[in-house]
Amino acid sequence: MKELLYMELAEVYHRLESTTKRLEKTEILAELLRSVDKELLPDVTILMLGRVFPIWSEEELGVGIKLLMKAISLVVGVSMDEIEDEIREQGDIGLASEKLFSRKTQTTFFSQPLTVEFVYSRLKALASASGDRAQSKKINILVEVLSQAKPLEARYITRTVLEELRVGVAEGIIRDAIARAFEVDPALVERAHMLTNDLGMVAAVAREEGEPGLGRLNLEPGRPVKPMLAQLASSIESAITELGRAFCETKYDGIRVQIHRCGDEISIFTRRLENITAAVPEILEGVEEALPADDYIVEGEIIVTMDGRPASFQYILQRVRRKYDVERLTREVPLSLFLFDVLYHREPLIDEPLRHRREVLESILSEIPGRVEASRMVDVGPDNLNDALWLFEESIREGHEGIMIKDTEAPYIPGIRGKKMLKFKAEPETLDLIVVGGTYGRGKRAHLVGSYLLAARDEDSGDLVTVAHVATGLDDETLQQLSERMEKLAIERKGRKLLVRPEIILEVAYSEIVKSPEYESGYSLRFPVVKRIRDDLCLDDVDTVGRIESLFQSGQPDQPG
């Protein structure tokens, strides 16, 4: 196998970071992918996203900024305070590392140039470090890699460790680069990625097997896919008119899950593709009873009910985030599952119409009342519109969010927010935005972050662009918890203001979207209010500037949605 020096990869990162032009980025990436040996191609493709593992992998590097700073301190020979000062000045750990490494006088004797294979294998080893001395093992691995790094390499190694590459490359650009590099249909690349969630695999197949190979990639139990997403419906009547015939289902306010059975193993994934099987034993037990022992992928919503009504979303988060006291929480906060789709049963079903998929689901599901049930659904057309209106009113009366309105003839399209699936809620539409900064209060509230700077996602570059500040909707207990999290995520401070690593996602309601030069997105939210913390979402779930623009043009949220 031909070696690829990590410096060559770092120089590609630098070229990508130096241009904002999508076509130029695509060509730079295509050139790299063409030149890489087939054995390294999957790894390099994933590294281009600033990740070490596919998004659905359970493996995590488990390295926070403090641990990384300690490794840098050992390699460069400066104090933690000096590193913090440099990060504050540069506003980025990558640039700070590059500057610190450029001052390093001591070099490792007989050190060899870093290769991509070596760096990638050592970064993967971080995820395997466990036990009583896990932190020490991780530091040793980081020191081993960084002690051989040149300044530019240090910039991108440190960013990769924190999964913050900052070169303006999102999945869409990599898909285009794969298509260009190996002269295959971009639509086939997109579909293959949609079905596998693994661009490294897609790149390797495109290179070795071309379009026929891409066409053979398909859904597999055990490998989760991104969920199909819903657009806003301005009214029930307009939605039914547009679709002609639709399944209307109760919209449950819970955590959307994808449940996979492969052989004897059942795995339960959230919409951010996180495996939560161990945290929800009663759901695991329920699906073992309610579904056959065939390979399958089903989709549904987990909710908490108390006194016969849906409980707060935060109760569900409490369940899925806890790794300990699971047995006690199972008794105190019991969960229910409502299934509404099947993507695989003995064979892939996503290209089948929803009507057929629902029939399959109902044929294989043995409902367990109160534990595992099919979602409540009515088949609606222009001739029985009142059935949809009844379901909406009944769902709201019972404490649910509203209804889903789905085209009965639509295939399942992972990761796409299209017009074949609509939602209509009692409350106005909200946005899921990520916190990138904040401002501390004054006086008695000086220890609390009272205002949060929010960002949306640029779908082309993957960059985060600011869109609003929000300071209302959080009680004192939640403010305290968020402030503690912000402290741990802080990367830069200036007076009362701080910038943070983008990890906290907030669901935000607002009265209106307006154009504004104050924020990088070009838009702002009037009277934003935090509805809830969305720890069930990941960066890819953050709403895009394109969606904000679409809502602005449609004048939302004038109607409930």
UniProtKB/Swiss-Prot annotation:
GO biological process, one term: DNA repair
Catalysis performed (reactions): ATP + (deoxyribonucleotide)n-3'-hydroxyl + 5'-phospho-(deoxyribonucleotide)m = (deoxyribonucleotide)n+m + AMP + diphosphate
Active site, UniProt feature: K251 (n6-amp-lysine intermediate)
Superkingdom of origin: Archaea
UniProt keyword list: ATP-binding, Cell cycle, Cell division, DNA damage, DNA recombination, DNA repair, DNA replication, Ligase, Magnesium, Metal-binding, Nucleotide-binding
Cofactor(s) of this protein: Mg(2+)
EC number: 6.5.1.1
Classification via InterPro entries: ATP-dep_DNA_ligase (IPR050191), DNA_ligae_ATP-dep_bac/arc (IPR022865), DNA_ligase_ATP-dep (IPR000977), DNA_ligase_ATP-dep_C (IPR012309), DNA_ligase_ATP-dep_cent (IPR012310), DNA_ligase_ATP-dep_CS (IPR016059), DNA_ligase_ATP-dep_N (IPR012308), DNA_ligase_N_sf (IPR036599)
Chain residues that bind ATP: E249, R256, R271, E301, F340, R417, K423
Pfam families from the UniProt entry: DNA_ligase_A_C, DNA_ligase_A_M, DNA_ligase_A_N
One term of GO molecular function: ATP binding
Family that this chain belongs to: Belongs to the ATP-dependent DNA ligase family.
HAMAP family: DNA_ligase
NCBIfam families: dnl1
Purpose: DNA ligase that seals nicks in double-stranded DNA during DNA replication, DNA recombination and DNA repair.
Protein name in UniProt: DNA ligase
Organism: Methanothermobacter thermautotrophicus (strain ATCC 29096 / DSM 1053 / JCM 10044 / NBRC 100330 / Delta H) (Methanobacterium thermoautotrophicum)
Source organism phylogeny: Archaea, Methanobacteriati, Methanobacteriota, Methanomada group, Methanobacteria
